[in-house]
Amino acid sequence: MSKKTSEKRPIIPENFTGLQEGEIPEFATGIKAIKSTLEHIARETGYSKGFSALNKMNQKEGFDCPGCAWPDPENRSSLGEYCENGAKAIAEEATKKKVDTEFFKQHSVNELLGWSDYDLGKSGRITEPMFLAEGATHYQPISWDAAFDYIGTKLKSLPTSDDAIFYTSGRTSNEAAFLYQLFARQFGTNNLPDCSNMCHESSGKALGETIGIGKGTVKLDDFAKTDLVIVMGQNPGTNHPRMLSALRETKKNGGKIITINPLPEVGLMAFKHPQKPMELLGKPTKLTDIFLQVKINGDVALLKALLLYMVCLLYTSDAADE
C-alpha cells in the first residue's frame, strides 16, 4: 500500500518545456508541415496504421478530427481533410505507446503534476482502470468491476440525482456522447455541460440576445464570397490551421482580411497550401491586409471604440435622413 505524503504539490510545470527563440518564418505550413506530419505518424503509430486513420478523418462515413471543430466542406479532398495539428492529434490518440502499471509505480502523483500536458500525452494510453486512494502517492490498478462499483457507490450516496454533474469534452465521439448522456438521463439529471460551455457560454448568450441564435450563422463557403473577414481573439495557424485554406479562398476571390492580435502569428501573415504543388514550390498567399497589434486585453478598448464609432455613424445617418 502506498504511503501518505505531506509533500507540497506543484500546480504547474516549474521548468520551461523546450521554448526556443528564433527568426520569424516568412510563411506557415508548406513542405515543413508535410515533413512534420510524416515524422509524427512514423513515431507514434507507424505509417500503415497512421495513414489508415488519416484517410478516414473528416471524411463521410469516417470520424471527426479530435483536434478542433473546424467544419468540413461539402466536397471533401481525396488527399485528406486534415492539417498538421489534426495529424498530430490522431497520432497521439492512436499511439502504440502504453502507460501500464509499471509506469505508475515509477512516477508518483506529485511528480506527474510537474509534467507538461505534452509530456503526459506523449507517455501513451492507459491500459486499465487506475485508482488513487486517499493519501496515496501513486495510482494503483483496479479491476473494471471495482471501478464500476466505486462510481456507483459515489452516485448512490448523493442526496439527489441533480447533485451530479456529468462533464465531458466537446470533441467526444457522437457514439460515446450519446451513451454518456443516456446514462446521465437514466440516472435522473440533465446536468451535462461540456467544454463548449466554458469556451462559448458568454458569446452564445450575447449572440442569442442580438441575432436570436447562440451559434455562428455562416457557412464554410461564405469565406469565398465575403468582402471582409476580421480575425480577432484567435490564432488559426496554431489552433485550427484548416481555417487558413478558407482565408486563402477569401484572398483568391478579392476579399480583405483584418487581423487583431497581440502576436503577428505567421499563419495569418502568409500561407502555403500543402495540397497545391505549384504553391508549395512558389510564393505563399499573403493573408492579412491590415494588422492591428493591440496589447494584451487591449481588444476590449478597441471594441468599445468601434462600437462608439458605429453609434456615431448611426446618429449621423439619421440626422442626414431628417
Named regions from a protein language model:
Residues 315-322:
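Conserved small/polar residues in nucleotide/adenosyl-binding loops
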Residues 2-313:
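N-terminal export/assembly segments and adjacent metallocofactor-ligating motifs
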